[in-house]
Structures are given as structure tokens and as C-alpha cells.
């Protein structure tokens, strides 16, 4: 094989050796010379010998121009169908040449849509994809880093040396490289050399899997191959309006719900133990459960409690456990703490098989400064604003996305679609929406910049949220999009076509604060704070509200729900039961945080797990029973959920009895004409003959009583129900004479089929005697 006579440009060799080349395919791989001949140039750092294998022939390559550039002449273009036998440090291996594969991965339309901010499936192009090119298996890498001087793929395959696999720059700041021979499971990062001469090692922003913390590399993972079993669930979900369904959510943090033992590792399907992931230093010997173990334990538990959905605190990859998941570095990857991408999919799949929806906390408002993450990604403020007055949350130590940049919005909007399309989640809760909407959020005067109109509103963030919700509901009309928005920003749950942000639910932070403030009061002072109980109804229909008692209310010295309550243990438990029952009967969808369903005593601690030992005590088990029955009642009575968001669904009977701290109201279902009566006594004083007005004559069945013995109460009540009396009250022609136990909420329903004599005989039987 004759040596090529091409005068090699030494500057290209030096640029390659210094990781400073942005178009390696211009000089590497098959190259046609001016006279029509072909030369193959191979970049092989630290190799001592390279032999080209093609069509049954071996061609020893030489390196006359640089020690690491091997070249040889061929009579025709070999394309990508040649292999290289490489000797390095006494070891010989064969491989394909990455620079022989020249097919552009990102097409012109992909680049156009991405630059426009409208490529809703950009993850199918960006990132690392196991792929077959020209019949050769490998991994296609694609990265956006428009301000980088050069980018290399580094990993186990290069001994983490950026000189081996420089990437090819394309139009629009896209960098690509197909690496033959790699596959799923390969660890990698991008080595980015900046215009200023600095070098950063970055995880893949679009990586689908990452190493377990504290390691930081991305892991090649295929999105293909998992066989979903939830087609019927998804079809049903997207054919109905979730606002017209019961929604009862169990919010949980996977890493602190329950731990396993270090001495009892998870056993893989092939019988080998999986390396345990330590839970925390504060609990020696504890390990995190895996996705399969969590599926085995969480799903039956949540189903038994009767919840319709699980809300998972952020599951995207994050380096620090103490952030609870809210400081994300891997937006496109379920955290590897608990297992693999497909194991997370299987968790969701099993939830759907058991009739449980999955809501994910999504964090598009900020990201951490970790060196391997998005911060200063390509030597420029690529994902964040450069000015800290609009680009940084100093109190949180995080950076704010630059929503005015199309590609950044595209990254986030497509990420939302990704979690629904590839991982089949059913809803999102967007964290800290207020921090996105206001430029002066947690900022003193002088440390924020007004918008172009002189206001404090972040108009770019508004447009981003509107775009995200519009795209979400375009693809997934039955999805839930929930805003944690703590201010009075208008139209949060109005459609974007009407000027709203486009969410379909908003956490009712006002209700939560009013309720907790009220229930923390000494019982006898509650009469002076009746407005805390009643005020939420006056604005209940201004947004589509979700009532939430979340993780934020049981940390940082706030104490858990039980210990917010006044009085003895007996009174505390009665208060918890009353609060939860009032919550389930109040307009709005429901969310409670893990541990509240059994009245955990201690604060939530991300480093530990729940106080499962408390379930051996009857008072705690009683709260579990209460939640079980509340969810069953809630789902069986459309009056409690169908008209949550219009005024027809709620009617006060009496909200003015401040002396007794008693309120009563009706919940109504317009579609079927059903209605229930709710009576609440929020003091430890019972009332033997408490009368409320009702609209219809007849028998009122006592459907629910939070003082029931099954719940740990005193079991006082109304012997299953009461007939109304022809005694007008509260603007109604009929009334009920009720027994109201202390600190109790009761639910009644009119039964048109019950006759007075039959009810009288039944009551006598319950008393063990006759009623005159």
C-alpha cells in the first residue's frame, strides 16, 4: 500500500492532540484527494500500530506526520465498512473507525424546530442513543454546546481521555459523533473545551440514566424494548376530564418512605445480589429500596388506603439527597438511586395495573451549580441568565433558567413531554411557581431587574408556562398539571387561550395555612377565629383548587400534623381525624403527605424513614382506618367531587355558630342530583340536641362519623341516622336534631326509601330495647 503523498497540515494534528478541533471528519476517516485517490486517516492516541482491514485485505497504516495519526491509501472509497486492528501498550483489539460514519443525525428540520423552541421530541435526537448505522451497532452522541471550542466524548472506552473521540460540530451549535462498538450501559461524559481555554467535564443534559451518586457520569440507556401493559389505562385517562373525577393523592418521597437492610440486598433475576445504595449516614445499616421493591410495597399500601394517585417528589436525577430532589442535574433520567430506567417504567406500569395514577414533581424553575450539571455549560451562560439579578436564587444557591432562549425552553417543554410519553406518568406538580413568576422573588430592592414594562412579573416565565401547558394538553388531554403557586397571581388554572397559565389545578395554600392556624389554636379560642374555617369558600371557585397538606408543613421545626394539635393525646388524635374529614368534604381535590395517614409523631426526616412501628398502636391504626374509609366515601359519593369547581357544588347550611365552633353545609352533584350534609364540631364539647336545617323531609343516613370506634373515637353518634322534623331552620322547612360528638365531622345523606316505622324498629334493636 503506497503512502499517501498529501502534505499533512500539522496544525490539524496539533489541534487534535490539544483537544481543540471542531471538525475532525474534515481530516479523519476516508478522504478523497484532488487526483481522485482515497486516503484513510485514523486518529489513535498512544497506539503503536494500526492495521486497516478491508475486503479480506490487511493494510498497515503509517504515521509520517504525527505519532498518533495513521494513514494509508486505498484505490476506492471504503465507506464505513472497514475495521482497525489497534496495538496499544501491548494489547491488540479490533474496532470500527468512528470517523468513517458520516451520516448527520440532526436533520435540517430538527435543527429548525429546536432553534425555534418547538421540537417537542428533541430527546429523540439529543443525548446518547444505541443505534445501528450502516449495519454497525454503536451509540450516537448528540449535544448542544454552541459556544464550545471543541467537545469530546469521554468514558470507560477512552479511559476518560478527551483526546480520543473529538466530536463533529454541525450547524446551530450541535455536536455529533457515532461511536461504533458501544452500547447500553456504557459510562460517559462530555469534555468541553471553552473559548477561554478552560476544560469542563459535563454529564449529558439529555442523558436517560446516570451513575448512582456521588458518581456523576451519564450511562447509555435505550428507550426501546420495554413492553408496556397500560394501553387501556392511557386510553381511559385521555378520554375523560380529571377535574370531573375523584382525585385523592398520596404524596411521597421514595428515599425516605421505607428503607431496606444492608444485610439483605435486592436479588436480581439471575440470582445475584445488587450492590446496595446507602440510605444515609444517620441510619447505619440502612439501604435504599429498589424500584421493584418499592413497587411491591408502596403500590399495595396505597391501593389499600384508597388513594387514586401517588405523587412522587422529584424523581429526576439529583446529586444531593438533602435537596429532596428539587435540585436536578439529570432532567431526562429517573434517579438511579433506586434502579434503572426500565425499572421505573415497571413501577409506573404496575401502578396503572392497580388503578393508581402517577404524578411527578417537576422542577423547571431552577437548577444547581454542580460542576457536572447545566451551570456555565459550554463556557457561557447557556441555560441560565448571565446577570445574577435575574439568573440566580441566592437564598437557594441555584440558577434560574433563561426562558427567553428558545433552545432552553425547548429543553424544558420537551422534558415535560418526555416524562409522559416515555415514562407514562399521568400528571405533574410544578414546584415553586411563584419563584418563576416574579423577578423580585426573595430579592431585596436593588437586586432584581424590572421587565420591559417596568414591572416585577417575569414575562418570559409566563410565556414558558403557557407553552408548556399548551403542549402538554395537546398531547395528553387527560393529564393533571398542578401549580404550587403561593401568591394571588390571577388565572393560574384558566386555559392559555383565555390568558391563563394553563394549569388545571392549583394548590390552595391559603386554605392550608388557615386550617393549620385554626387547628393549632386552643379549642376554646377557636370561636374567635371561625373565619379561618369559612373564608376559603368565598374564593373556592376562583381557581381549580387542590387542598394539600404537603411535606413542607412537617419539616424544619414545624412538627408533624399530630403535634400541631392542642390538648392531650386523645384530643390531638380527634383533631387530626376532624381535620382530615373536613378536608375530604371541602371542595377541591386532595393531597396529603406520607405519614399523615397514620398520624406520625415525629417530623419528616429525609435521612430516615417513616415511623412504621406506630401502626402497632390502636390510635395510629385508627387514623389509617379513617383515611381508608374517607377515600372509599369520597369515591362513592359524586357530590364530594363532581362539582368541586363551581358554586353549585357547595351550599352553607350554617357558618355563623361561632359560640360552638360548629359549621354545616351541603355538597351537591348537579349531574345526578345527589347531595350530602356535612356537620363539623371543632371543640371538645359534645352537643346532644344540635339542630340544623335540611331541604327535604325524610331519613338522613349517617354515612360517616370521625368519632367512630374504628377510628379511635368515643363512638358517639346518631344510631345510623335521623329522620327530619317538621321544624324550619336555617331557611329550610325541615331540620335534624343531631348528636354531635366532640371534635367530630359527620356526613349524612338523605335516603328517600327509608320509612319512619322501619327506622324506629331498627334504632330500638340497636339500643337493645323498645322505643315508645
From Swiss-Prot:
It comes from Synechococcus sp. (strain RCC307). It comes from the Bacteria. GO terms for molecular function: 1,4-alpha-glucan branching enzyme activity; cation binding; hydrolase activity, hydrolyzing O-glycosyl compounds. It catalyses: Transfers a segment of a (1->4)-alpha-D-glucan chain to a primary hydroxy group in a similar glucan chain. Belongs to the glycosyl hydrolase 13 family. GlgB subfamily. Pfam families: Alpha-amylase, Alpha-amylase_C, CBM_48, GlgB_N. It is an enzyme of class 2 (transferase). This is 1,4-alpha-glucan branching enzyme GlgB. GO terms for cellular component: cytosol. Its EC number is 2.4.1.18. Disulfide bonds: none annotated. Catalyzes the formation of the alpha-1,6-glucosidic linkages in glycogen by scission of a 1,4-alpha-linked oligosaccharide from growing alpha-1,4-glucan chains and the subsequent attachment of the oligosaccharide to the alpha-1,6 position. The lineage of its organism: Bacteria, Bacillati, Cyanobacteriota, Cyanophyceae, Synechococcales. Pathway: Glycan biosynthesis; glycogen biosynthesis. InterPro entries: A-amylase/branching_C, Branching_enzy, GlgB, GlgB_N, GlgB_N_E_set_prok, Glyco_hydro_13_cat_dom, Glyco_hydro_13_N, Glyco_hydro_b. The gene is glgB.
Amino acid at each position: 500500500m503506497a503512502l499517501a503523498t498529501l502534505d499533512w497540515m500539522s496544525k490539524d494534528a496539533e489541534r487534535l492532540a490539544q483537544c481543540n478541533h471542531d471538525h475532525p471528519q474534515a481530516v479523519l476517516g476516508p478522504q478523497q484527494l484532488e487526483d481522485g485517490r482515497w486516503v484513510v486517516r485514523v486518529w489513535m492516541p498512544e497506539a503503536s500500530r494500526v492495521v486497516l482491514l478491508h475486503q479480506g485485505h490487511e493494510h498497515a497504516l503509517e504515521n509520517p506526520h504525527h505519532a498518533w495519526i495513521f494513514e494509508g491509501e486505498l484505490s476506492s472509497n471504503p465507506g464505513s465498512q472497514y475495521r482497525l486492528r489497534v496495538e496499544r501498550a501491548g494489547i491488540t483489539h479490533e474496532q470500527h473507525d468512528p470517523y468513517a460514519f458520516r451520516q448527520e443525525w440532526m436533520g435540517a428540520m430538527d435543527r429548525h424546530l429546536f432553534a425555534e423552541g418547538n421540537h417537542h421530541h428533541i430527546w429523540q435526537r439529543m443525548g446518547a442513543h444505541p443505534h445501528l448505522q450502516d449495519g454497525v451497532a454503536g451509540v450516537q452522541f448528540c449535544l448542544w454546546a454552541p459556544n464550545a471550542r471543541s467537545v469530546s466524548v469521554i468514558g470507560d472506552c477512552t479511559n476518560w481521555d478527551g483526546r480520543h473521540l473529538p466530536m463533529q460540530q454541525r450547524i446551530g451549535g450541535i455536536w455529533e459523533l457515532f461511536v461504533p462498538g458501544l452500547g447500553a450501559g456504557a459510562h460517559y461524559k462530555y469534555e468541553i473545551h471553552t473559548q477561554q481555554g478552560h476544560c469542563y467535564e459535563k454529564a449529558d443534559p439529555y442523558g436517560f440514566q446516570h451513575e448512582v451518586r456521588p458518581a456523576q457520569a451519564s450511562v447509555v440507556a435505550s428507550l426501546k424494548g420495554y413492553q408496556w401493559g397500560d394501553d387501556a389505562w392511557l386510553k381511559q385517562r385521555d378520554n375523560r376530564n380529571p377535574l370531573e373525577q375523584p382525585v385523592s393523592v398520596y404524596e411521597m418521597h421514595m428515599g425516605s418512605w421505607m428503607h431496606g437492610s444492608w444485610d439483605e440486598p435486592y436479588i436480581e433475576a439471575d440470582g445475584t445480589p445488587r450492590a446496595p445504595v446507602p440510605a444515609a449516614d444517620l441510619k447505619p445499616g440502612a439501604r435504599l429500596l429498589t424500584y421493584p421493591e418499592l413497587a411491591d410495597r408502596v403500590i399495595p399500601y396505597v391501593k389499600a388506603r384508597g388513594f387514586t394517585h401517588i405523587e412522587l417528589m422529584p424523581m429526576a436525577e439529583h446529586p444531593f439527597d438533602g435537596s429532596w430532589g428539587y435540585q436536578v442535574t439529570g432532567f431526562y433520567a429517573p434517579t438511579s438511586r433506586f434502579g434503572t430506567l426500565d425499572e421505573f417504567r415497571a413501577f409506573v406500569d404496575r401502578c396503572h395495573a392497580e388503578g393508581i395514577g402517577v404524578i411527578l414533581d417537576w422542577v423547571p424553575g431552577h437548577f444547581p451549580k454542580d460542576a457536572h450539571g447545566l451551570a456555565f455549560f459550554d463556557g457561557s451562560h447557556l441555560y441560565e441568565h448571565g446577570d445574577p439579578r435575574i439568573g440566580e436564587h441566592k437564598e437557594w444557591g441555584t440558577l434560574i433558567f433563561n426562558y427567553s432562549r428558545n433552545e432552553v425552553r425547548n429543553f424544558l417543554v420537551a422534558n415535560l413531554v418526555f416524562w409522559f410519553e416515555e415514562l407514562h406518568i399521568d400528571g405533574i406538580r410544578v414546584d415553586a411557581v411563584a419563584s418563576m413568576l416574579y423577578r423580585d422573588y426573595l430579592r431585596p430592592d436593588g437586586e432584581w431587574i424590572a421587565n420591559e414594562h417596568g414591572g416585577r412579573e417575569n414575562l418570559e416565565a409566563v410565556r414558558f408556562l403557557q407553552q408548556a401547558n399548551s403542549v402538554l394538553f395537546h398531547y395528553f388531554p387527560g393529564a393533571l398539571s398542578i401549580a404550587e403557586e403561593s401568591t394571588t397571581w390571577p388565572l393560574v388554572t384558566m386555559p392559555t387561550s383565555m390568558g391563563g397559565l394553563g394549569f388545571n389545578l392549583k394548590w390552595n395554600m391559603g386554605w392550608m395555612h388557615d386550617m393549620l392556624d385554626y387547628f393549632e389554636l386552643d379549642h376554646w379560642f377557636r370561636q374567635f377565629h371561625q373565619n379561618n374555617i369559612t373564608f376559603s369558600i368565598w374564593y373556592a371557585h376562583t381557581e381549580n383548587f387542590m387542598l394539600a397538606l404537603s411535606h413542607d408543613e412537617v419539616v424544619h421545626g414545624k412538627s408533624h400534623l399530630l403535634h400541631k394539635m392542642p390538648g392531650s393525646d386523645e384530643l390531638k388524635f380527634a383533631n387530626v381525624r376532624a381535620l382530615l374529614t373536613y378536608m375530604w368534604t371541602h371542595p377541591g381535590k386532595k393531597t396529603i403527605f406520607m405519614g399523615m395517614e397514620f398520624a406520625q409523631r415525629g417530623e419528616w426526616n429525609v435521612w430516615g424513614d417513616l415511623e412504621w412501628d406506630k401502626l402497632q398502636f390502636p390510635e395510629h391504626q385508627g387514623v389509617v382506618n379513617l383515611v381508608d374509609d374517607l377515600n372509599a366515601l369520597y369515591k362513592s359519593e359524586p357530590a364530594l367531587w363532581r362539582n368541586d369547581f363551581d358554586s353549585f357544588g357547595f351550599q352553607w347550611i350554617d357558618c355563623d355558630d361561632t359560640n360552638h365552633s360548629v359549621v354545616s353545609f351541603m355538597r351537591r352533584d348537579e349531574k345526578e342530583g345527589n347531595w350530602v350534609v356535612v356537620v363539623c364540631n371543632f371543640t371538645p364539647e359534645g352537643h346532644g340536641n344540635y339542630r340544623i336545617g335540611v331541604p327535604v323531609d325524610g331519613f338522613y343516613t349517617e354515612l360517616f362519623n370521625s368519632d367512630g370506634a374504628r377510628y379511635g373515637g368515643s363512638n358517639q353518634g346518631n344510631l345510623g341516622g335521623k329522620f327530619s322534623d317538621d321544624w324550619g331552620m336555617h331557611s329550610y322547612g325541615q331540620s335534624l336534631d343531631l348528636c354531635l360528638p366532640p371534635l367530630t365531622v359527620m356526613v349524612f345523606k338523605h335516603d328517600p326509601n327509608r320509612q319512619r316505622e322501619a327506622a324506629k324498629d331498627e334504632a330500638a334493636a340497636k339500643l337493645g330495647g323498645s322505643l315508645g
